[in-house]
């Protein structure tokens, strides 16, 4: 099976007024194959959410590369950045709905709607996921 998510030397730094430059993720490498199940475990503040946000495209890398389904979506050294809506991912957030005016079904269906998946297929896939 091919690698579906690849992170190469991914680093994320933030600059704050009080602490200066803080490294949230440092030289992280990851390869996830199709069908694999995985989770990020670690204490608060260790970079789990930041890593997921970089994969989804909500945070830019400070260094490194991210590839999804065989195509590069973020390569800092080449100034390559594919926005979240063009990465082919959906994300369920841990705190509240992404769109509070939508119910759970509508929130889960939204990425499929954006991709213009037929309505009957959306209903089938969302029901399977929930």
Model-derived regions: residue spans:
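Conserved ABC transporter NBD signature motif
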Residues: 64-76
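ABC ATPase NBD coupling module
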Residues: 73-90, 114, 119-123
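A short, flexible loop at the N-terminus of ABC-type nucleotide-binding domains that lies
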Residues: 1-4, 13-27, 78-79
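The feature captures the beta-strand-to-loop junction immediately N-terminal to the Walker
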Residues: 41-43
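Short helical segment in ABC ATPase nucleotide-binding domains corresponding to the A-loop/adjacent helical element
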Residues: 93, 104-113, 123, 127
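Helix-to-loop junction immediately C-terminal to a conserved catalytic motif
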Residues: 56
